[in-house]
Amino acid sequence: MIRKLLLILGISVASLANGQSLATATFAAGCFWCAEEAFEKVPGVVSVISGYTDGKTQKPSYEEVSSGRTGHTEAVEVKFDPGKVSYEKLLDVFWVNHDPSYTDRQFCDHGSQYRPGIYWHDEEQKRLADASRVKYGKLKTFKQPIVTPIVKASQFWPAEDYHQDYYKKNPVRYKVYSTGCGRYSRLDELWGKLRK
């Protein structure tokens, strides 16, 4: 069963030669296209799936989530090898790739479907997420308080195929969107050298 799942994900058993199994992390950082790009660049991350979480309907579509009526937020599910990258490192990537001072928007995207969040899968992830919020709150790189919630993970629904790897499949459109949205200039303003 595990071997079949790994093959479905496009992961060879050899990639887990260290004897550990993959772990899962779930984050919402606004537009899932941008979050997917940020996490896919991290060594030790095996896959990143764009999708929806923290909502009240089954198998939501992009159109339904975009309406704001399903309660879902755009998120990414990150599969990673904990022998190669720590959950703490993924938390660092998360923090510097979103604006933690808003509860219902990220950059030019407004609405509850763009709310940020850390969705923990076990008590250790919760503990580490709480500690990371304290750590980033003490940095005082900006004036507003951190309002990003840390919530128990719920059902994650993969988004439609055309959303997966959007930044790779549509690089020009993605660049126009992410630049026009002011995402990177705002992140640099918030986090400065921490983003490098």
What are these regions (language model features)?
Residues I2, N18-K196:
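Flexible coil/turn and secondary-structure edge motifs
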